[in-house]
Design a protein with these regions (language model features):
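Glycine-aromatic micro-motifs
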Residues: 1-134
């Protein structure tokens, strides 16, 4: 199964620890979505936004990995699954079930994401824009 990570799961160390079978394939961009931070947990989320882009990491994961991600993402309470096609391939990601106002992430959580951006060689401008710094 193909999985699109855009938040803390971009971090290769964390992803491998959580999902032992996972393999990072490449960086990709999800068009017409934007990255934001929401909920009392101040967690990363994506929402539809015309002419916006969310960079992320494409991972191959096993069924066992998917079950572990479901637990981590508090599926189906906090996050729901969202599927999209990318060059004919079906890809799964998570998006929050309840959209709340923007909440700045904790420093610890943000550092995990920053490491993930580095691991996946993503442009930080997207993260800075989501944090309302740009």
């Amino acid at each position: 199964m193909l999985y699109f990570a855009y938040g803390s799961n971009l971090n290769h160390f964390q992803m491998k620890k959580r999902c032992k079978d996972s393999k990072f394939l490449k960086k990709i961009k999800l068009k017409d979505f934007r990255l934001t931070f929401r909920s009392k947990y101040r967690a990363a989320d994506i929402e539809a936004r015309k002419n916006s882009t969310v960079p992320g990491g494409l991972f191959e994961i096993s069924k066992s990995d998917e079950r572990k991600l479901d637990v981590y993402e508090d599926y189906p309470l906090l996050y729901k699954k969202y599927y999209f096609n990318y060059y004919g391939k079906k890809i799964m990601t998570y998006t929050m079930t309840k959209k709340t106002k923007f909440k700045y992430p904790t420093e610890r959580y943000l550092n995990v994401i920053k490491c993930g951006y580095k691991d996946c060689k993503l442009e930080k401008k997207y993260l800075l824009k989501a944090l309302m710094i740009l």
